[in-house]
Amino acid sequence: MSDKYIMAIDEGTTSTRAIIFDKKGNKVAEGQKEFRQYFPQPGWVEHDANEIWNAVLSTIANSFISSGIQPKQIAGIGITNQRETTIIWDKETGLPIYNAIVWQSRQTSDIAQKLIDEGYSDTIHEKTGLIIDAYFSATKIRWILDHVEGAQERAEKGELLFGTIDTWLTWKLTGGKVHVTDYSNASRTMLFNIHDLKWDKEILELLNIPEALLPEVKGNSEIYGQTAAYHFFGSQVPISGMAGDQQSALFGQLALEDGTVKNTYGTGSFIVMNTGNKPVLSKNNLLTTIGYSIDGKINFALEGSVFVSGSALQWLRDSMEIIESAPESERAANESTNHNEVYVVPAFTGLGAPYWDSDARGAVFGLTRGTTKNDFIKATLQSLAYQTRDVLDTMEKDTGIKIPVLRVDGGAAMNNYLLQFQSDLLNKSVERAGNLETTALGVAFLAGLAVGFWKDTDELKELFTVGRRFEPEMSDDAREYLYAGWKNAVEATRIFKHKINENL
C-alpha cells in the first residue's frame, strides 16, 4: 500500500477520464464518463460545465474503485484538457453564468470577422501567434459578456472569473482557492502575448475584456495548489501538472528536441512541431503557440489544426452507416481494388490549417460506375493522410527544417493501412508510440516531475518506446500524382462553396 502513483485527468470534448500511472509510465487504472453535447443552433457547440465537473468526480472515484488504489497514494495530479473551450462563472457561488462554449463552436464568427474587417489580423498574429478565428477563447468571452445580462458590469467589478477547462477544474478541485492556468492553455486564448508572457493589455482593451476575469499564468510543471479534502476522498494531493491536450501529447511523445513533430489522430488531427526556445511566426497560416514550460524555460511550438480526422470515420459509421466500427475501415481499405482515384474532402465544418476556410463544405471527386463501398471508405481514410501532408509541407516551408520522422498517436493511429499510406504520402518514417495514451501520459510526466516522482526528462526518455515504425514504399511519381489530385480536389471544393455564396 506504500506504492505511489500519478493521476492524470484527461478532459476531452466528448468524455473525461481519470488515469492512474505507475513509475514505469504504465496505466494501472482508468475511469471514463461521457457527457452531453449541446447544439442550441446550427454551428453552435456547448457543454454544461457542471456536468463536466461531475464527470470528473465520477471518473476519479471509478479509477480508485477499479484498482483498489487509495487517494493518499497519489503523489500528484496532472490536468490536460480540450483547449479554447470557455467558461465564465460567479466567483462567490461557483455557478457558471452560461454554458461552456466549445472550441468547435462557430457562434462567435461575427466577432472574429469584425476584428478582421477592422484590420487587426497582423497585430493579433504578431502578439499571440494565432490567426483571428472563432476557434479561440477571446471571441467566446466577448460573446458571453455581450449576451448574459449584467455580465460586463459584473466582470468589471471582479465578481466573475474566466477559465478554460484546466482552470475550471483546478478551481473546483481546490475548493475555489486557486484561479490559475498554464502557458500552453493561455497561448490558445488569443489574449496572451507569447513574447512578454503576459495577458496583452492592448487586445484586452480592444475587446473590452476586464483583466480581473483572467487567471494567473504559470508553467506546466509546478505545484498550483492542493485538492480540497472533501473533493478528493479525504486527501489533500498536489495539483502539479497542467497542459492543453495537444501540448500534453507532444510532451507525452517526448518530442523534446527542436524540429520533432507529432500528430494526434483524434476527432481532428493536430500536428505540432517543437521549435525550441524561440517562436516561429508562420507566414502560411499555421499557429505559433507555447509547447511547454519547465523550470522557467519556455519551449515554443508550431501547430496545424485539422478539424475533421477521426470524426470522418465516425461519419462513415453513424451517418452513412457503411461501416459498423472505425477499425473496420482498415479491412475495407485493404480490400479496395481501385487505383486511389477517389478523393473525399471532409470539410464538414470548413477547412482548418493551412486553408482556414470556414465556408468550405465536404465533397467527393472521382466517382465512377465501378466505385465500390470499399473504395469510398479507403478514400475517406486517405483524407486523414492528405490533410496531414498539407500541414507538414507548410511546416517545412515555415521553418526550413526537413522533417525526417512523424510521431503519431490517437485512436486512428492503430490503423496500419492509414500509417503506411501516411508514410508513403510524406516520404517519411512514421513512428507509432508504444504507449498510445500520450495525452494523459504527457501531463502525468509534467505532474510527476514537479513532485519528484520522476527525477528529470532523461529518466522519462528511458520509458519511451516505439510501437511500430512504417517506412515509405511508394514511388515518387505515384506519390506526387496522388497528392496533386488531392490539391485539385481541395481547390474545387473551395471554389464550389464560394461560387454558391457569390450567386446568393
Curated annotation (Swiss-Prot):
Source species: Ligilactobacillus salivarius (strain UCC118)
Keywords for the protein's UniProt record, in alphabetical order: ATP-binding, Glycerol metabolism, Kinase, Nucleotide-binding, Phosphoprotein, Transferase
Its biological purpose: Key enzyme in the regulation of glycerol uptake and metabolism. Catalyzes the phosphorylation of glycerol to yield sn-glycerol 3-phosphate.
Modified residues (Phosphohistidine): H231
Superkingdom, natural source: Bacteria
Top class in the EC scheme: transferase
Modification note: The phosphoenolpyruvate-dependent sugar phosphotransferase system (PTS), including enzyme I, and histidine-containing protein (HPr) are required for the phosphorylation, which leads to the activation of the enzyme.
Subunit structure: Homotetramer and homodimer (in equilibrium).
Kinase listed as a keyword: yes
Positions annotated to bind glycerol: R83, E84, Y135, D245, Q246
Name of the protein in question: Glycerol kinase
GO molecular function: ATP binding; glycerol kinase activity
E.C. designation(s): 2.7.1.30
Pathway in which the depicted protein is active: Polyol metabolism; glycerol degradation via glycerol kinase pathway; sn-glycerol 3-phosphate from glycerol: step 1/1
Catalysed reactions, as listed in the record: glycerol + ATP = sn-glycerol 3-phosphate + ADP + H(+)
Record text on activity regulation: Activated by phosphorylation and inhibited by fructose 1,6-bisphosphate (FBP).
Family of the protein in this entry: Belongs to the FGGY kinase family.
Gene3D superfamilies named among the record's database cross-references: 3.30.420.40
Gene designation per UniProt: glpK
Positions annotated to bind sn-glycerol 3-phosphate: T13, R83, E84, Y135, D245
Pfam families linked to this entry: FGGY_C, FGGY_N
InterPro entries named among the record's database cross-references: ATPase_NBD (IPR043129), Carb_kinase_FGGY (IPR000577), Carb_kinase_FGGY_CS (IPR018483), FGGY_C (IPR018485), FGGY_N (IPR018484), Glycerol_kin (IPR005999)
GO biological process per UniProt: glycerol catabolic process; glycerol metabolic process; glycerol-3-phosphate metabolic process
Keyword Cytoplasm attached: no
One CC-aspect GO term: cytosol
